[in-house]
Amino acid sequence: MSTLPISSVSFSSSTSPLVVDDKVSTKPDVIRHTMNFNASIWGDQFLTYDEPEDLVMKKQLVEELKEEVKKELITIKGSNEPMQHVKLIELIDAVQRLGIAYHFEEEIEEALQHIHVTYGEQWVDKENLQSISLWFRLLRQQGFNVSSGVFKDFMDEKGKFKESLCNDAQGILALYEAAFMRVEDETILDNALEFTKVHLDIIAKDPSCDSSLRTQIHQALKQPLRRRLARIEALHYMPIYQQETSHNEDLLKLAKLDFSVLQSMHKKELSHICKWWKDLDLQNKLPYVRDRVVEGYFWILSIYYEPQHARTRMFLMKTCMWLVVLDDTFDNYGTYEELEIFTQAVERWSISCLDMLPEYMKLIYQELVNLHVEMEESLGKGGKNISNSLCQGRWQKELGSQITLVETKMAKRGVHAQPLEEYMSVSMVTGTYGLMIARSYVGRGDIVTEDTFKWVSSYPPIIKASCVIVRLMDDIVSHKEEQERGHVASSIECYSKESGASEEEACEYISRKVEDAWKVINRESLRPTAVPFPLLMPAINLARMCEVLYSVNDGFTHAEGDMKSYMKSFFVHPMVV
């Protein structure tokens, strides 16, 4: 991004004086509690991008195969044969798991709507545990509120799932996946989850278990489908689907070609963003900041990976990286006095604040303004009504002020644990996850209105639940490291102090809170929804991202294991078609 002169920006006027300690910028021997982060593991390998020679041909093949799959979806949906509808949900499941559902959103919606209207609560293959579980999961995922009472036929007179079901491995696996669509007080699905976990573990350990099934069980126990990112599931599922004797060759070929085409697009975007980041020269100007631009782009792809969201993806990416800068500044470098001034400057958003800031903060402040201007100019060129598209702008500034102000106050209080409820109310502001979800709507002119931004700025339950999941999963894996570097107490320490629980007990309690938050997400995804269904996906995908990012440790700061492997699959290793 080119540097825009800050004097060219139209600022709001403010008559309130900025309270400044004249000695802030000149204090000698300022003590800074910095932490030395590891350098980027990627170096400069993504700065350049070479377009594959066969990219145009692949795009043409994708378009041809899309038409074939679309015809099949429409044809099967139009059949009057009930068992063809069983085949239809299996096809939809494969399309979704192969990562190509975004090509067929209308066809999938119409097909599942037709199935819901046609069968209601009486699925045609209701005695088949695998089939009814798949039917239930797909309809719930699409927002149709089918009752979990459909599983009562698989329970005994005591209300427990029949032990005879353990002989149906595929059915047990399908029921397990369906159970993750549960909402609050849905005892049947709670019991289903407990029952299937036990039996899947036994099945996977059986030497006679099919290797493909064992792989699927291990993946499911590690991360259920409801919480899997689409692109990662596509990587997992393609080899499994290919082994199925009844697989659709056109569908498989489309999935591989589409993954390859998107991979090229993403690598090109990553090259652009790496150049932008390198040109900022923050490694020299702000050496305390984590150099995690590749990890940041992976993070953003979890929210939007589709081609039509390229512009929004770039807005999100730059927002993400500047939030990393702010996070490291508040957690790892700035003094209390500096942070207080910066808080006031962000709140006023006025040019008069610039001279009051320390030199390193002037850079941050100016670049935040530049990003805002860049977004305005880009949206203006696109013919969008900026007053609607950025109606949350004032809210973002207010939220930014709250973030910095609360972080500052917490830093001044030190690392002492406060009540968990207080910690959660504060961390929902300081985490900035709600801001990222709001920014995910900027640049989307399709179904986004001024009411959309009013809705997201009200912090509705699905946004809160998504933010809770991110915050708590981060705490579970990183609280020890945070304490070692003198960070504020996490939810683990807060609950331990409040309840007298051990660290292990606290982690178990916080994990249950994560499960409760997922139930809220599932409930808020059922129709009728507060906003169009596609606008719920950024909140859902943000929560899904945590299942990858915080599966073992803080995968953003320490990209190791699965996290590193996934990024290599996305950006380094070409898809073999």
From Swiss-Prot:
Cofactors that this protein relies on: Mg(2+); Co(2+); Mn(2+)
Principal location class: cytoplasm
Keywords associated with the record: Cobalt, Cytoplasm, Lyase, Magnesium, Manganese, Metal-binding
Residues spanned by motif DDXXD motif: 327-331
SUPFAM superfamilies: Terpenoid cyclases/Protein prenyltransferases, Terpenoid synthases
Catalysed reaction, written as an equation: (2E,6E)-farnesyl diphosphate = (E)-beta-farnesene + diphosphate
Tissues expressing this chain: Expressed in flowers.
GO terms under biological process: diterpenoid biosynthetic process
Binding site for Mg(2+) 3: 474, 478, 482
Record entry for activity regulation: Strongly inhibited by manganese at concentration higher than 20 uM.
GO cellular component term, pick one: cytoplasm
EC number(s) given by UniProt: 4.2.3.47
Molecular function as annotated in GO: magnesium ion binding; terpene synthase activity
pH effect on activity, per entry: Optimum pH is 6.5-7.5.
Pfam families in the record: Terpene_synth, Terpene_synth_C
KW Transcription regulation (keyword) present: no
Annotated residues for binding of Mg(2+) 2: 327, 331
Keyword Repressor: no
InterPro entries in the record: Isoprenoid_synthase_dom_sf (IPR008949), Terpene_cyclase-like_1_C (IPR034741), Terpene_cyclase_plant_C1 (IPR044814), Terpene_synth_N (IPR001906), Terpene_synth_N_sf (IPR036965), Terpene_synthase-like (IPR050148), Terpene_synthase_metal-bd (IPR005630), Terpenoid_cyclase/PrenylTrfase (IPR008930)
Annotated function: Sesquiterpene cyclase catalyzing the production of beta-farnesene from farnesyl diphosphate. Unable to use geranyl diphosphate as substrate.
Entry similarity comment: Belongs to the terpene synthase family.
Protein name in the entry: (E)-beta-farnesene synthase
Natural source organism: Artemisia annua
Gene: CASC125
